[in-house]
C-alpha cells in the first residue's frame, strides 16, 4: 500500500490560471512540459521590445483606450483569470464534469427556438465545416478557463490534438520545462516557476501545451493587440438591427463568434488585422434560449470565481439562488477591455455555450470541455470554443484555415512543412474516432423493433460509456441517444432493458457531464420508477441517476415532485440507495424558495426521524437538507417553525452529543449554525431550545462531560476556531437581544456604515430560471446593457425587505416582544440555570481564544448575559472570575469593538453592583484605563510603538482600524470580524437577502488606491465607492481579491490602526482599509466611535469616581501602598535583610493583589534586578540574595546554615503564588500579534462546509506569481548573465528552486574567461546529468548564492518570504502594512519586478552549507565542543587529574536584560524575563547548594501561560502562515528562550513548522487537524508534496542494511519507506516496524555500545533467539572508553553512534518513532548540556554507584567542615579525619583505586591502577569518577552521534524541548494503562461494527486490562511500532479502526485469528463468541504476527 501522492489532476490543472497577466497561461497540467513537470518552471518574458511592450501593457491591463464601445466600456482588469482561478480549472478532472446546466425552467417560446434553429442552419451553411475539435480535458476546462484563454488573446493556436502545433510553439514550450524537477513536485505536477519567454511561448503554454493530455483544444484563436480593439469598435459601431438574433448581435459586438464563419472572415475582402478570432468550432448553442439568460450566465461568470466545487453532492452544490449572487466574488462586471470576446458577453457566452453546447448535433457538446455551470443557458454572446459540428466534410479545409490563421498572425509558412501531416493525422485520429461511429451503430440498435436487439445494443452502449471519457467519446450523439434510452426506460414489461437503459444514462452523465442537460428530460420517467416499484434494481439505478442529475438540476427534480418520490420507499432500499435518496433531498433543498416549500413539507417528518439513524452519510445528508432549508427560509418565521416542528430540535440536539460523534467537524459547524439562525430569526424556537435544556448540551460540547458543579475549574475540550465561533454564536442567540439605545446606540456604528440605509423594500429581477435576485448597481448596469443588446425585457418585482423592519442597526428589537425576553421574565429559574451553566464557559472561551472572530462573539454573548441577569445572579456568577482585570485589559485593546464592549460592560456592572465594583475597578486598573481614555487626545490613533501591531491584552490582536473600517464595510459581510452575521443583534449585516451562505462568497471589498487607474476608470470607482457595502460589488478582480484576503475582511482586523487617518493614500493601496467604503464614512465612523468612547469614558468617571479626590485614603489602595513600600526595600545598595521579601511573600500569597497593582508598583523590574544584578556596588552578593529568596519563598536554609545531610526543603506555595500572579500580569500586558486568516468557515449550507481558513489565501498564492528579474551579481563576471528577461516565480517556491532552474541551464558553471557569448538560447540545453542529480538527491552541493540587495537568501526560504522580507521596495511599505494587516503583503509585491542577484558559491563556504536543514557551519559546532578543550585539558586531566569544573546552568538565565535571541518588543517583556528567572531558579536551585535534592521546586507545567498558548496554537493552525513560513518572530523566540510558557504539543508543532521544510510542516498540520483538508486541499497547495523513497531490506541483515539505507537517504528530504524482502506489505506499518526493529538491534550486547545488564528477549522471533540484549532500567547510556582502548574498536563504536544519530534525526524528520529507552544524561548530551552533568545524573545511569558516591560526598563535606573549624588543632583534626567512615569503614579500608567503578581497565588518571583512594584525595577521586562516567569516557561516542544527527538537521532546533521531553519526541508516549472510555473516544468501529457491538466492547475491556508488555505487543502488531505517539491513541493517525472479519456461513469465527492492515491501523476482528476466546486469539496473533507483512 504505497502512500504515494497521486498526481492529482487538480494540482496540475491549477497552473492554467497562474498567468498573472493572463498573457501566459502556463498549463503544465495540460502537459507541454511532458518530460518534466518541474518544480521550477520559470517564465522568461519577451525580449523583442515591441512585443514585450504590448504584452506587458496587456498584462497590466493598460490596453490603449481606443475602444469606447459600450460593450466593453468597463475597467480593464488584468487578472480576471486570477480571480476566476479557483473555478473549474482547478478541479480534478473527475470533478470537472459534474457541473452541468440546469435547464429546468425554460421560459422561452418555441418561435424563438425555431428562429434560432433556422439561423443555425444558415450559419452552418456559411461555414460548412466548422472545426471538429472537441475540447475535452483541461484545455478549456470550464468556461472560466476558456474565457481566460480568450482573454489572454495570445496568439494561441489550438491544433487538432494540439501535440505539436507549430515549430515556434514547440520551441517556446521548451524553455518552460525543467528536467531537473524535484521528484516531489514532479509527482505532484506542481510547477513553481513559469516561463513566459516570448510571444510564441505565451501562446504555446496554453496551446501547444495542450498536447500531453491530448486535449483537442477548442480551435484556434489569434491575438491581435490593438487591432482587435479597433475591429471590435468598428463592429459594434455597425450595430445590427434589433431583429437579429441575440447571438449574432453578441458576436458582432464582441467579435467572439461561436459559429465562426472562417471563409468569410478570411476572404480577401476582410482586412485580417482587424479580425477578432474566436475558437473555431464554437458550439452551436442556437438551440438554446435567446438572450435573456445570457444575463444570468454573465452574472454567473462574473461571480464564479471563488466558487468551489467538489465531487460529493453535499459538498458541491451551492444553492442556486446563492449561486447567482455569490459569483460576484469573481471578477468585476467590468471585466476587461482586454477581454476580447469575453469583455461583456464573453463570460456569459462561455457559460451559455458550455451549457448549450450543440445540443442538437449528433456530435454533441458533451465533449467540449468547459465545465458546466448551473447558470441558465444562453446569454449575451461572445464565443468560447465549445466546438462541435456535424462530421466535418473536409479536414483539409480545416488545415487550410488553420494555416491561413497562423500566417495571418505572421508565422512563417515554411513551418507548416513538417507539421502539416501530423496535424491532420491528429485531427482525424481524435475526431473521427471509432467511438462516435460505434455509437451511431448502437443508436440504430436501440431504435430497432426487436427487443433482443435493443437489449444487446443497450448492453453494449453501457460498456462503451462506462469505459469512455470525454476524450474517447468525441462526437458522441447524446442528443439522439438520450431519447432512445428514455423510450427503452419506459418498457415496463422488460426489466433488463429498463435497468440497462437506466445504467447507460448514469454512465453517460459520468463520462460526459455535459449530457446531463439532455438527460434532464428523463426525470419524470425516473420518478415513475420510484412511485411504483416493480423492480428494485431499476428503482435503485434510477436513484443513482437522479443523484447525479440533482447535482446540477435539483430544481427540475424538486418541481417534478421528486423529493417526495425519492423518499417514498426509503426504508426498502439498500443503504447505498438510501444515501443517494437523501443526497437528492439535500440537493433539492439547495436553493429552494418559500413558494416551493410545499414540495418538501410532507417529507419533513421522515427526514426528521432520519436524524436518529446510525449511518453517518445518511445523517450528514439529512443535516445538510435541514441546514439548507433553514438557510433559505431564514426570514420566513412561519416556515422555520414548520421546519422545526417535528422533533427536529430534539433529534439534532441528541445528534450533537452522541459519543463518539457521528458528525464531521464541518457538519457540526453547519448544524450549530443552523440552530443559531433559527434562534436569531425565530425567538420562539430559542425558547423551545432553552426549555429542552440546551445549556447542558452546550456546556457538554465546550467542556466535555462535567463532573460536579460548573463553577469549578473549567477545562475546554479542544475545538477548532470555527466550532467555537458557531457555539458562542448560538449561546449569544439564545439570549434576548440588547436594546439599541443608551450605551448600546453606538453598536449601530460598529455594525455598518451609516451610508447603508436599509430600504423598506428591495427590487429584484428574475433570471431565466425564474429565480429572483436583488438589484445592485453593478448588476443593474450589466443587465441594462445585455437587455439592450439582446432586445430582451425582464420581469422585476418589489419586495418588502425582511431586514428593514429590524431597522438599520441590524437588531430585531423593533419587532414585537422578543420571546426570549419574555422567558427571562416568566421563568427566572430557567434563565438563572442557563446563565450559571454557560457564563463561566463563555468567559473561558474568551480568555483562551486568539481569533478575533470568536472573541467578538463571546463579548456579545457575555454582554447579553450581564445585561439580562439580575444583580444577585450576577454576583453569584462573577465571584469566580477576575472580571475587572479583564475589563481593564480590554480597555487597553487596540480594537475599537473590544474597547466599546468593555465600556458597556463596565457601565452595566457599575449600575447593577456599584458597591462591589467601585473597589475592584480601582484596584484592577479599570478606572485608570477609563481615565486614560477620557483624557487621551488622539484616542487610540497612535498606540505606543511597542504595541502598534499588538492586541488588546485580552489577546485580541485586532486593532483599531478594524472596528471602524469594518464598521463601514457593513455588508461585505465581514464586519471586520466574521461575526458571520446570523444573529439579529450582531447580524443582519448581510445583504438585503442576508443569506449566510453567500457571505463568504462575496468577500470582495474594492480597494486599491494608487494603482486604481490601471484597473478602472476613476469615475466608476467613485460610483462604486458608496456602494461598496453592496454585497455583490466587486472591483477589479485582483484588487478585490487582495481585499478579500486582507484579514480585516475576516476576523483579523488590520492592526495598523493609525494608518487610516494618517496616510489615507497609502493605506488605500496597501492595507486595504480604505476604499472599503467611502473614505468619509470610514473616517466619520471611526471618529464617531472614538468620540463616543471618549465621551462615555468621561461620563463614567464623572458618574462613579468623581466623588473622592483620591488622596490616598481609599481602602482600595492599601495593598498597592504596602507593595510599593516593600518594593523600595528591595534595594541593592542597602542590605535590607530578608524582611522585605517576607512582606512581599505575604502580599503575594495572602492578599489578592491585582496584576494592575503589581505592574504599577514597579515590583517586577525591582525583583528582576534583585535576583540577577551582579555589579560591584551591590551591598550583598547575588548568591546570598538568591538563597535568601529561596529561604523566604521555599523554606530552604539561610546562607551559611546549610545542614550536613540533604537539603530537602518543602513548601513551594509562596513561589507558586508568585508565579501565578506573574503569569496573570503577562496575560494582561502582552500584546503579541497573531497573524491568522480567520473567517468562519464556508457557506454554511452551500455544501463546501470546509474550514475555509487559509484556503482562500492559499488559492491566491496558487494563482499569482512574483515577477523577478534574475541578474548576475556585479561582483562576479565568471558565470553567464541571465538574458531571459523577467521570470515569473511561484511565490511558495523555495529559493533553491531558482538555483536548480539556473544550474541545470548551465548558469552554475564558473568560467575562466569572460565570454558573454552564450545567451539564453542555452535554455534549451538543459544539462541532463545535473538535472538527474538534483532530482535524486536531497543534498546537492549548492552552486549559486542569491541576494536581494545586500541580504543573502537562505535556500529553504520561500521566494515570497524573501521578497517580502528583503526586497527594497518592500521597505517603504513596512510602515503602513505588515503581515498583521495584510497577509499577502501589499499589492506592490505582486506587481513590481523584484531583482534577485546570483553569484557562485565560494569554495570555502561550500563545506558549511551541505545540509538539508539549511544549517550553516555545523562543521564547527560539534568538534569545537571538545577539541580545543581536549587539547589543553587532556594533559591536565591525564597527568594531574584536574577536571573542568561543573558549569552552573542557572548562570545563563540570571540576566536582567533580554538574551540576544529575543528581538521582539512588548510591554510584557520584563514580566517575561522575571518568569524566565523564576523558572530557572525553580529548575536549577540545587546548583546553589552542595548537597541539595535534585528536584524542581515547581513543576514546569505550572508556568504554562494559557493565553500565549492559545495564541500559539491559533497561529500554528493557520495553513497560510505555515505555507509562507511566516511564523511571527515572537513565537519562535519565546519557544526557544522560554519553552515553559507552552505545553509540549504546542512546541512540538512549532518545532515541525520551523525545523523542516514547508511540506513536512503542512503534513504535520494536516495530521493534527484533519478537517483543514476536508474540502479543497486536493486542488490547492495545502496538500503537502512530500517525496517518498522506497527501500527494500532483508530482515536477516537488518542492521547492516539499515546503515546503508541511512548512508544513502539519511540526509535526503524524501520520506523513507521500507519494505521487506519476500513480503508484500508496504507503507506505514513496515516502515514503523523498521525503526522499532533497528532500535532493538542497536541494543544487542555484542555491539558494546551501552552500559547495563545482558538479558534475552521474552518473546524472541527468528534471529533474535539466543541473542543477548542490553537492558538498563534507568535508560541507556554510552559505555565509557578508557585512554587505552583499541582504535579499531573505538572507530566501530563511533560508526554505530553516527548511524544512531542519523536514524534518530530521520525518525524525527519523518514523524516516526524509535524504540530506544535512552537515559536522561543521553538527552542532555543531545542538547549540549554535558558540562552541567553532576553526581545527580549518575542516578540515571548506575544507581548503585551513585548511592556510594553520595555517601562518599557526605564524608567530603564533613572533612571540609572539620578543616574550616578554627578550634581544631592539627592533631585533633588528623584524628577526627581518620574517624570519618562510610558504613563503619574508613575510606582507606574501602580498597578503592583511581579506576572507574565497574571498569577496572579504565584509569581515571595516568597510573591510576596503582593510586589508592584515601581521605585526602577522596574529593579528587569523586570528581574524576563523575567526569569520566558522564563526560570524558563517552565524549567520542557523543561527538559522532551529534555529527550523524546534524547531517540530517541541526540539533539547535531541539532547543524547544527540555531533556526529559526528548524521550516523548523520539519514542512517543510513556506507557500507561488504557481505559475503556479513552479507547471508545479514539477508536473507530466500521464495516460491520459499531460502538455498541459486543465484539468492540469485549476488545476495549481486554485492552484496558493489558500490562505493559502486552500493550507493546499489541501495538507492534496493529501499527508496526510498539509505542504510541505523544497523546496516546488520540494522536494515532490514522485512528485505530476495528472492522469485522467476515466468514462463510460454514466457518466458525472462533477458529480464526484477527489480522491487521498496519498502513491504516485496521484491526480485522472476528466476532468471537466470548471474551476469553478473544483475549487468547489476540495475544496469539500479537505474539506470532510480529515481523512479517503478508496479505491476510
From Swiss-Prot:
Gene Ontology terms: biological process: DNA damage response; DNA repair; DNA repair-dependent chromatin remodeling; heterochromatin boundary formation; proteasome-mediated ubiquitin-dependent protein catabolic process; protein polyubiquitination; regulation of embryonic development; ubiquitin-dependent protein catabolic process
Biased composition annotated in UniProt, kind: Low complexity: 154-166, 175-216, 948-973, 1029-1040
Superkingdom of source: Eukaryota
Main localization (coarse): nucleus
Lineage: Eukaryota, Metazoa, Chordata, Craniata, Vertebrata
Protein name: E3 ubiquitin-protein ligase TRIP12
Region named K-box: 1496-1570
PROSITE patterns cross-referenced by the UniProt entry: HECT, WWE
InterPro entries to which the protein is assigned, alphabetical: ARM-like (IPR011989), ARM-type_fold (IPR016024), HECT_dom (IPR000569), Hect_E3_ubiquitin_ligase (IPR035983), HECTD1/TRIP12-like (IPR045322), WWE_dom (IPR004170), WWE_dom_sf (IPR037197)
SUPFAM superfamilies, sorted: ARM repeat, Hect, E3 ligase catalytic domain, WWE domain
Residue ranges constituting the WWE domain according to the UniProt record: 749-836
Amino acid at each position: 500500500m504505497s502512500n504515494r501522492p497521486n498526481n492529482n489532476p487538480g494540482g496540475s490543472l491549477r497552473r492554467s490560471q497562474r498567468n498573472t497577466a493572463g498573457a501566459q497561461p502556463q498549463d503544465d497540467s495540460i502537459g507541454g512540459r511532458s518530460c518534466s513537470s518541474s518544480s521550477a518552471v520559470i517564465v522568461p518574458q519577451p525580449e523583442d521590445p515591441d512585443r514585450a511592450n504590448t504584452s506587458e501593457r496587456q498584462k497590466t491591463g493598460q490596453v490603449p483606450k481606443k475602444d469606447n464601445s459600450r460593450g466593453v466600456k468597463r475597467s480593464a482588469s488584468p487578472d480576471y483569470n486570477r480571480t476566476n482561478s479557483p473555478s473549474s480549472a482547478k478541479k480534478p478532472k473527475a470533478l470537472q464534469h459534474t457541473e452541468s446546466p440546469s435547464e429546468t425552467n425554460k421560459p422561452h417560446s418555441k418561435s424563438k427556438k425555431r428562429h434560432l434553429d433556422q439561423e443555425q442552419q444558415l450559419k452552418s451553411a456559411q461555414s460548412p465545416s466548422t472545426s471538429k475539435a472537441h475540447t475535452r480535458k483541461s484545455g478549456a476546462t470550464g468556461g472560466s478557463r476558456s474565457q481566460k484563454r480568450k482573454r489572454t488573446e495570445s496568439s494561441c493556436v489550438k491544433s487538432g490534438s494540439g501535440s505539436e502545433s507549430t515549430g515556434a510553439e514547440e520551441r517556446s514550450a521548451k524553455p518552460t520545462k525543467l528536467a531537473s524537477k524535484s521528484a516531489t513536485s514532479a509527482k505532484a505536477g506542481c510547477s513553481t516557476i513559469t516561463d513566459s519567454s516570448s510571444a510564441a511561448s505565451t501562446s504555446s503554454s496554453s496551446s501547444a501545451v495542450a498536447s500531453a493530455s491530448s486535449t483537442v483544444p477548442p480551435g484556434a484563436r489569434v491575438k491581435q493587440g490593438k487591432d482587435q480593439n479597433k475591429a471590435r469598435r468598428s463592429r459594434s459601431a455597425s450595430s445590427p438591427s434589433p431583429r437579429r438574433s441575440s447571438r449574432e448581435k453578441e458576436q458582432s459586438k464582441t467579435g467572439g463568434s461561436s459559429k465562426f464563419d472562417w471563409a468569410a472572415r478570411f476572404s480577401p475582402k476582410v482586412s485580417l488585422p482587424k479580425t477578432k478570432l474566436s475558437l473555431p468550432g464554437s458550439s452551436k448553442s442556437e438551440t438554446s434560449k435567446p438572450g435573456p439568460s445570457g444575463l444570468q450566465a454573465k452574472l454567473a461568470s462574473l461571480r464564479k470565481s471563488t466558487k468551489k466545487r467538489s465531487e460529493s453532492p453535499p459538498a458541491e452544490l451551492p444553492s442556486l439562488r446563492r449561486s447567482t449572487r455569490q459569483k460576484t466574488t469573481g471578477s468585476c462586471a467590468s471585466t476587461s477591455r482586454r477581454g476580447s470576446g469575453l469583455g461583456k458577453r464573453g463570460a456569459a457566452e462561455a457559460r451559455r455555450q458550455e451549457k448549450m453546447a450543440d445540443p442538437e448535433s449528433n456530435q454533441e457538446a458533451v465533449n467540449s470541455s468547459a465545465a458546466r455551470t448551473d447558470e441558465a443557458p444562453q446569454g449575451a454572446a461572445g464565443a468560447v470554443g465549445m466546438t462541435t459540428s456535424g462530421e466535418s466534410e473536409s479536414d483539409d479545409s480545416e488545415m487550410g484555415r488553420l494555416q491561413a490563421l497562423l500566417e495571418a498572425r505572421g508565422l512563417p509558412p515554411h513551418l507548416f512543412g513538417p507539421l502539416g501531416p501530423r496535424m491532420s493525422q491528429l485531427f482525424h485520429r481524435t475526431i473521427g474516432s471509432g467511438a462516435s461511429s460505434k455509437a451511431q451503430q448502437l443508436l440504430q440498435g436501440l431504435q430497432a423493433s426487436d427487443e433482443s436487439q435493443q437489449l444487446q445494443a443497450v448492453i453494449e452502449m453501457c460498456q462503451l460509456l462506462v469505459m469512455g471519457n470525454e476524450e474517447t467519446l468525441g462526437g458522441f450523439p447524446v442528443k439522439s441517444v438520450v431519447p432512445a434510452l428514455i423510450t427503452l426506460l419506459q418498457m415496463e414489461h422488460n426489466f433488463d432493458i429498463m435497468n440497462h437503459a437506466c445504467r447507460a444514462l448514469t454512465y453517460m452523465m459520468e463520462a460526459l457531464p455535459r449530457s446531463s442537460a439532455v438527460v434532464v428530460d428523463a426525470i419524470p420517467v425516473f420518478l415513475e420508477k420510484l412511485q411504483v416499484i416493480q423492480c428494485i434494481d431499476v428503482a435503485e439505478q434510477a436513484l443513482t441517476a437522479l443523484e447525479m442529475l440533482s447535482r446540477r438540476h435539483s430544481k427540475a427534480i424538486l418541481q417534478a415532485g421528486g423529493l417526495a418520490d425519492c423518499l417514498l420507499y426509503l426504508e426498502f432500499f439498500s443503504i447505498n440507495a438510501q444515501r443517494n435518496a437523501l443526497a437528492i433531498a439535500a440537493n433539492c433543498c439547495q436553493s429552494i424558495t418559500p413558494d416551493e416549500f410545499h414540495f418538501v413539507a410532507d417529507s419533513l417528518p421522515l427526514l426528521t426521524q432520519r436524524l436518529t439513524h446510525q449511518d453517518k452519510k445518511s445523517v450528514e445528508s439529512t443535516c445538510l437538507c435541514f441546514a439548507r432549508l433553514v438557510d433559505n427560509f431564514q426570514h420566513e418565521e412561519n416556515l422555520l417553525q414548520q421546519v422545526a416542528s417535528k422533533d427536529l430540535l430534539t433529534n439534532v440536539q441528541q445528534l450533537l452529543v452522541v459519543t463518539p460523534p457521528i458528525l464531521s467537524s464541518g457538519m457540526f459547524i453547519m448544524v450549530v449554525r443552523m440552530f443559531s439562525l433559527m434562534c436569531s430569526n425565530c425567538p420562539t424556537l430559542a425558547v423551545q431550545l432553552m426549555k429542552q435544556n440546551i445549556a447542558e448540551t452546550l456546556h457538554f460540547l465546550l467542556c466535555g462531560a462535567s463532573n460536579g458543579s460548573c463553577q469549578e475549574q473549567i477545562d475546554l475540550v479542544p475545538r477548532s476556531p470555527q466550532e467555537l465561533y458557531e457555539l458562542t454564536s448560538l449561546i449569544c442567540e439564545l439570549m434576548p437581544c440588547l436594546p439599541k439605545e443608551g450605551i448600546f446606540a453606538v453598536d449601530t456604528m460598529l455594525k455598518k456604515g451609516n451610508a447603508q440605509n436599509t430600504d423598506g423594500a428591495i427590487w429584484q429581477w428574475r433570471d431565466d430560471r425564474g429565480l429572483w435576485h436583488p438589484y445592485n448597481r453593478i448588476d443593474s448596469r450589466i443587465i441594462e446593457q445585455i437587455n439592450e443588446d439582446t432586445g430582451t425585457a425582464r420581469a422585476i418585482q418589489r419586495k418588502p425587505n425582511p431586514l428593514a423592519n429590524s431597522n438599520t442597526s441590524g437588531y430585531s428589537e423593533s419587532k414585537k416582544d422578543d420571546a426570549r425576553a419574555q422567558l427571562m421574565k416568566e421563568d427566572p429559574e430557567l434563565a438563572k440555570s442557563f446563565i450559571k451553566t454557560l457564563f463561566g464557559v463563555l468567559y473561558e472561551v474568551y480568555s483562551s481564544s486568539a481569533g478575533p472572530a470568536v472573541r467578538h462573539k463571546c463579548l456579545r454573548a457575555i454582554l447579553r448575559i450581564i445585561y439580562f441577569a439580575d444583580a444577585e445572579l450576577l454576583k453569584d456568577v462573577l465571584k469566580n472570575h477576575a472580571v475587572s482585570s479583564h475589563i481593564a485589559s480590554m480597555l487597553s485593546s487596540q480594537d475599537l469593538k473590544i474597547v466599546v464592549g468593555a465600556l458597556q460592560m463596565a457601565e452595566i456592572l457599575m449600575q447593577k453592583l456599584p458597591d462591589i465594583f467601585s473597589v475592584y475597578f480601582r484596584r484592577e486598573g479599570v478606572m485608570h484605563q477609563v481615565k486614560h481614555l477620557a483624557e487621551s487626545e488622539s484616542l487610540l490613533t497612535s498606540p505606543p510603538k511597542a504595541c502598534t501591531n499588538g492586541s488588546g491584552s485580552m489577546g485580541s490582536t485586532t486593532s483599531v482600524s478594524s472596528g471602524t473600517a469594518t464598521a463601514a464595510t457593513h455588508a461585505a459581510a465581514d464586519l471586520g470580524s466574521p461575526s458571520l452575521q446570523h444573529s439579529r443583534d450582531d447580524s443582519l449585516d448581510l445583504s438585503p437577502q442576508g443569506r449566510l451562505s453567500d457571505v463568504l462568497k462575496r468577500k470582495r471589498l474594492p480597494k486599491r488606491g494608487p494603482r486604481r487607474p490601471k484597473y478602472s476608470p476613476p469615475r466608476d470607482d467613485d460610483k462604486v465607492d458608496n456602494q461598496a457595502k453592496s454585497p455583490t460589488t466587486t472591483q477589479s478582480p485582483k484588487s478585490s481579491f487582495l481585499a478579500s484576503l486582507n484579514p480585516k475582511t475576516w476576523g483579523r482586523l488590520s492592526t495598523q490602526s493609525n494608518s487610516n487617518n494618517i496616510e489615507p493614500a497609502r493605506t488605500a493601496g496597501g492595507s486595504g482599509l480604505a476604499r472599503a467604503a467611502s473614505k468619509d464614512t470610514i473616517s466619520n465612523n471611526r471618529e464617531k466611535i472614538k468620540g463616543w468612547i471618549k465621551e462615555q469614558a468621561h461620563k463614567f468617571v464623572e458618574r462613579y469616581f468623581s466623588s473622592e479626590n483620591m488622596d490616598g485614603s481609599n481602602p482600595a489602595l492599601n495593598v498597592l501602598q504596602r507593595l510599593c513600600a516593600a518594593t523600595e526595600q528591595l534595594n541593592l545598595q542597602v542590605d535590607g535583610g530578608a524582611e522585605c521579601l517576607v512582606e512581599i511573600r505575604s502580599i503575594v500569597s495572602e492578599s489578592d493583589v491585582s496584576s494592575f497593582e503589581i505592574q504599577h508598583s514597579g515590583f517586577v523590574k525591582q525583583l528582576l534586578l534583585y535576583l540577577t544584578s551582579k555589579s560591584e556596588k551591590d551591598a550583598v552578593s547575588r548568591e546570598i540574595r538568591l538563597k535568601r529568596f529561596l529561604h523566604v519563598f521555599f523554606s530552604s536554609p539561610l546562607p551559611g546554615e546549610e545542614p550536613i545531610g540533604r537539603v530537602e526543603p518543602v513548601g513551594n506555595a509562596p513561589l507558586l503564588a508568585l508565579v501565578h500572579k506573574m503569569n496573570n500580569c503577562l496575560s494582561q500586558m502582552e500584546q503579541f500579534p497573531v497573524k491568522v486568516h480567520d473567517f468562519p468557515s464556508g457557506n454554511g449550507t452551500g455544501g463546501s462546509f470546509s474550514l475555509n481558513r487559509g484556503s482562500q489565501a492559499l488559492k491566491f498564492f496558487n494563482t499569482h506569481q512574483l515577477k523577478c528579474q534574475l541578474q548576475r551579481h556585479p561582483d562576479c563576471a565568471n558565470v553567464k548573465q541571465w538574458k531571459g528577461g523577467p521570470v515569473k516565480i511561484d511565490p511558495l517556491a523555495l529559493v533553491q528552486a531558482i538555483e536548480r532552474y539556473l544550474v541545470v541551464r548551465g548558469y552554475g558553471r564558473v568560467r575562466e574567461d569572460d565570454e558573454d557569448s552564450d545567451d539564453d538560447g542555452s535554455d534549451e540545453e538543459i544539462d541532463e546529468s545535473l538535472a538527474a542529480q538534483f532530482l535524486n538527491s536531497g543534498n546537492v552541493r549548492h552552486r549559486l548564492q542569491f541576494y536581494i540587495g545586500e541580504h543573502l537568501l537562505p535556500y529553504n526560504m520561500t521566494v515570497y518570504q524573501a521578497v517580502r522580507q528583503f526586497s527594497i521596495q518592500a521597505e517603504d511599505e513596512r510602515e503602513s502594512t505588515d503581515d498583521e494587516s495584510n497577509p499577502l503583503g501589499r499589492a506592490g509585491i505582486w506587481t513590481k519586478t523584484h531583482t534577485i542577484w546570483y553569484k557562485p558559491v565560494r569554495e570555502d563556504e561550500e563545506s558549511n552549507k551541505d545540509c538539508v536543514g539549511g544549517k550553516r557551519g555545523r562543521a564547527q559546532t560539534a568538534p569545537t565542543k571538545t577539541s580545543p578543550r581536549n587539547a589543553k585539558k587532556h594533559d591536565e586531566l591525564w597527568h594531574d587529574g584536574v577536571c573542568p569544573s561543573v558549569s552552573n546552568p542557572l548562570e545563563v538565565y540570571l540576566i536582567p536584560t533580554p538574551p540576544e535571541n529575543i528581538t521582539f518588543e512588548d510591554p510584557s517583556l520584563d514580566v517575561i524575563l522575571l518568569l524566565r528567572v523564576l523558572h530557572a531558579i525553580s529548575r536549577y536551585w540545587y546548583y546553589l547548594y552542595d548537597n541539595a535534592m535534585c528536584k524542581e521546586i515547581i513543576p514546569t507545567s505550572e508556568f504554562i501561560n494559557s493565553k500565549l498558548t492559545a495564541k500559539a496554537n491559533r497561529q500554528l493552525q493557520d495553513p497560510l502562515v505555515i505555507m509562507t513560513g511566516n511564523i511571527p518572530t515572537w513565537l519562535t523566540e519565546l519557544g526557544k528562550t522560554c519553552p515553559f510558557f507552552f505545553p509540549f504539543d504546542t512546541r512540538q508543532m512549532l518545532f515541525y513548522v520551523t525545523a523542516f521544510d514547508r511540506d513536512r510542516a503542512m503534513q504535520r498540520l494536516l495530521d493534527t487537524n484533519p478537517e483543514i483538508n476536508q474540502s479543497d486541499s486536493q486542488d490547492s497547495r495545502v496538500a503537502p508534496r512530500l517525496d517518498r523513497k522506497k527501500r527494500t531490506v532483508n530482515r536477516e541483515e537488518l542492521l547492516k542494511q539499515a546503515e546503508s539505507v541511512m548512508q544513502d537517504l539519511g540526509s535526503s528530504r524524501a520520506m523513507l519507506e521500507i519494505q521487506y524482502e519476500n513480503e508484500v506489505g508496504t507503507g506505514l506499518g513496515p516502515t514503523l516496524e523498521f525503526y522499532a526493529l533497528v532500535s532493538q538491534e542497536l541494543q544487542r550486547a555484542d555491539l558494546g555500545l551501552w552500559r547495563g545488564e545482558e538479558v534475552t528477549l521474552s518473546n524472541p522471533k527468528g534471529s533474535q533467539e539466543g541473542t543477548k540484549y542490553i537492558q538498563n532500567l534507568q535508560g541507556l547510556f554510552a559505555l565509557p572508553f578508557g585512554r587505552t582502548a583499541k582504535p579499531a574498536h573505538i572507530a566501530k563504536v563511533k560508526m554505530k553512534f553516527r548511524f544512531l544519530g542519523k536514524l534518530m534525526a530521520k525518525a524525527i524528520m519523518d514523524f516516526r518513532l524509535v524504540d530506544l529507552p535512552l537515559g536522561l544524561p543521553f538527552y542532555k548530551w543531545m542538547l549540549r548540556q554535558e558540562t552541567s552533568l553532576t553526581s545527580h545524573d549518575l542516578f540515571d545511569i548506575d544507581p548503585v554507584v551513585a548511592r556510594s558516591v553520595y555517601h562518599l560526598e557526605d564524608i567530603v563535606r564533613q572533612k571540609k567542615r572539620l578543616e574550616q573549624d578554627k578550634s581544631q588543632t592539627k592533631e585533633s583534626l588528623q584524628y577526627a579525619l581518620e574517624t570519618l567512615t562510610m558504613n563503619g569503614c574508613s575510606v582507606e579500608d574501602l580498597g578503592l583505586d583511581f579506576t572507574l567503578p565497574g571498569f577496572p581497565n579504565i584509569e581515571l588518571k595516568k597510573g591510576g591502577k596503582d593510586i589508592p583512594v584515601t581521605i585526602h584525595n577522596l574529593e579528587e577521586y569523586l570528581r574524576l569518577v563523575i567526569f569520566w562516567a558522564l563526560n570524558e569516557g563517552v565524549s567520542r561516542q557523543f561527538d559522532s552521534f551529534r555529527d550523524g544527527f546534524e547531517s540530517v538537521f541541526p540539533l539547535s532546533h531541539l532547543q524547544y524541548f527540555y531533556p526529559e521531553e526528548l524521550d516523548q519526541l523520539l519514542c512517543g508516549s510513556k506507557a500507561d494503562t488504557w481505559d475503556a472510555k479513552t479507547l471508545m473516544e479514539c477508536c473507530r468501529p466500521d464495516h460491520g461494527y459499531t460502538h455498541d457491538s459486543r465484539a468492540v466492547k469485549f476488545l476495549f475491556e481486554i485492552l484496558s486490562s493489558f500490562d505493559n508488555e502486552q500493550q507493546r505487543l499489541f501495538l507492534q502488531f496493529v501499527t508496526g511500532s510498539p509505542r504510541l505517539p505523544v497523546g496516546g491513541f488520540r494522536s494515532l493517525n490514522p485512528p485505530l479502526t476495528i472492522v469485522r472479519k467476515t466468514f462463510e456461513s460454514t466457518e466458525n469465527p472462533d477458529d480464526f485469528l484477527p489480522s491487521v492492515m498496519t498502513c491504516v491501523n485496521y484491526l480485522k476482528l472476528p466476532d468471537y463468541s466470548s471474551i476469553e476466546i478473544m483475549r487468547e486469539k489476540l495475544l496469539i496473533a500479537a505474539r506470532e504476527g510480529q515481523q512479517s507483512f503478508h496479505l491476510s
